């Protein structure tokens, strides 16, 4: 057994011991963190720590060992809505979407985990098929949206299975070498790029609350908060936000809950000039404002897709009048003003220039006429050019453009068969393909510039060996 597989087994058994100690029959572990973000810092990558699966979405479900004796010894099959019959072998499973069907089987220990596509079977369906009535399934409410929690609760209760709020995330309890949280400094996003100063956005939000007769709205989506305040940060890989939460009131006041480490005292005056007066509190006190809102019978608006179940359950415990719907920042954030539209235009021109330079370089490198049209000579000459070299070269052309900040996501740089993995990440691969390992090269990449964000995907001929079937498939995709 490989070292990584052995670690997966040790960690899974440690989780099962926690379940047994807490008299919980099963657990569902979500990929997301308390902000319900797919882009996780290293200290929030719980499924990766537990199973080695590094995708940006998914769930892991485990059934307690002391419960195994109650389970049927006969093979269990689940028939889904498409009339597909799925065999449920193991008592540990990972559920992913179609982007990761190939990747998950390469990364996890298949001796202990079954892997399933979420379109075929979901964790709650798997548990309902395997567990007897009266069982208890634990989840960390912080890592599930409120709407997902309600859907889980309804599905499990139909099978007479209870959903339990775990006091602590079981992965956190066994993660002894867990990385420290990342708290980067708040950065001001200048009005010349955002097109609408923060005080105006705040005024618009307060007007909306008054029009709808809400006392307050709870905002737990860092992207919405950073948009509202016209700030940026570096707490997330390739996502320029700071982790924080907020309560906005109909009278225009804001309570911003954020770690002290995020704000440089020397910059606080400049920050207040930029966003207007704001009451700042340590994020660890966020539950206090929820209890206050609950006990005061306030009318509170929240987005059940971007606010986690812990937050809304806490509001429910008192007398808060909760209304649910699309977050009040979502639509204004999506409707770009003329400054933002002009910025995106400029960003895409810069990015287009960078990618044209990259493809010109690649065309010259892979021109067979340089190698006497000899495929063996070609392979020897370009053998040191792998997927990492290509990705880094593409970024180097972007870096020379004005106002470049960073990649907008991990570059998917894939030669040959690696392109079959929808979210292939060369930085996590055991072996990198090189030019000559396949005729096709696919690069999906993008960048953050001060004036806009880009995302471009291209598949190009980068070596000998193209077949009629490849041409046909490429043409069908292009169409």
Q: Where on the chain are the PLM-derived regions?
A:
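Active-site neighborhoods and metal-handling regions in enzymes and metal-associated proteins
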Residues: 1-479
């Amino acid at each position: 057994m490989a070292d990584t597989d052995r670690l997966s087994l040790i960690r899974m058994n440690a989780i099962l011991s926690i379940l047994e100690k807490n008299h919980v029959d099963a657990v569902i572990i979500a990929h997301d963190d308390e902000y319900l973000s797919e882009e996780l810092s290293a200290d929030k990558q719980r499924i990766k720590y537990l199973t080695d699966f590094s995708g940006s979405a998914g769930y892991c479900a485990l059934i307690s060992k002391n419960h195994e004796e109650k389970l049927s010894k006969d093979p269990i099959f689940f028939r889904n809505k498409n009339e597909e019959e799925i065999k449920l072998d193991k008592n540990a499973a990972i559920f992913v979407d179609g982007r990761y069907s190939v990747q998950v089987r390469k990364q996890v220990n298949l001796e202990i985990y079954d892997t399933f596509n979420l379109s075929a079977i979901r964790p709650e369906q798997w548990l309902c098929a395997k567990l007897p009535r009266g069982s208890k399934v634990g989840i960390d409410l912080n890592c599930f949206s409120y709407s997902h929690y309600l859907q889980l609760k309804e599905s499990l209760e139909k099978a007479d299975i209870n959903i339990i709020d775990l006091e602590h995330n079981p992965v956190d309890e066994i993660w002894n070498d867990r990385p420290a949280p990342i708290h980067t400094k708040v950065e001001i996003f200048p009005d010349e790029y955002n097109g609408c100063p923060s005080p105006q956005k705040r005024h618009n939000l307060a007007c909306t609350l008054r029009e709808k007769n809400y006392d307050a709205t709870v905002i737990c989506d860092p992207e919405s908060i950073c948009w509202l305040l016209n700030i940026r940060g570096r707490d997330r890989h390739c996502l320029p936000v700071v982790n924080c939460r907020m309560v906005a009131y109909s009278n225009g006041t804001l309570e911003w809950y954020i770690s002290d480490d995020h704000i440089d005292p020397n910059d606080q005056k400049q920050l207040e000039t930029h966003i207007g007066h704001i009451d700042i509190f340590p994020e660890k006190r966020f539950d206090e404002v929820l209890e206050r809102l609950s006990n005061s019978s306030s009318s509170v608006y929240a987005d059940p897709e971007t606010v986690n179940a812990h937050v809304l359950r806490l509001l429910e415990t008192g007398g808060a009048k909760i209304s649910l719907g699309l977050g009040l920042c979502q639509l204004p954030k999506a409707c770009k003003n003329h400054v933002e539209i002009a910025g995106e235009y400029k960003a895409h021109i810069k990015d287009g220039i960078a990618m044209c330079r990259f493809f010109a370089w690649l065309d010259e490198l892979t021109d067979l006429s340089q190698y006497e049209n000899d495929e063996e000579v070609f392979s020897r000459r370009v053998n040191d050019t792998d997927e990492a070299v290509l990705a880094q070269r593409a970024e180097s052309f972007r870096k020379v453009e004005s106002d470049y900040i960073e990649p907008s996501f991990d570059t998917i740089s894939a030669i040959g068969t690696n392109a079959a993995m929808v979210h292939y990440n060369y930085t996590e691969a055991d072996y990198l393909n090189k030019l000559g390992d396949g005729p096709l090269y696919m690069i999906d990449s993008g960048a953050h510039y001060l004036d806009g964000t880009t995302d471009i995907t291209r598949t190009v001929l980068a070596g000998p060996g193209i077949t009629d079937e490849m041409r046909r498939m490429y043409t069908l995709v292009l169409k």
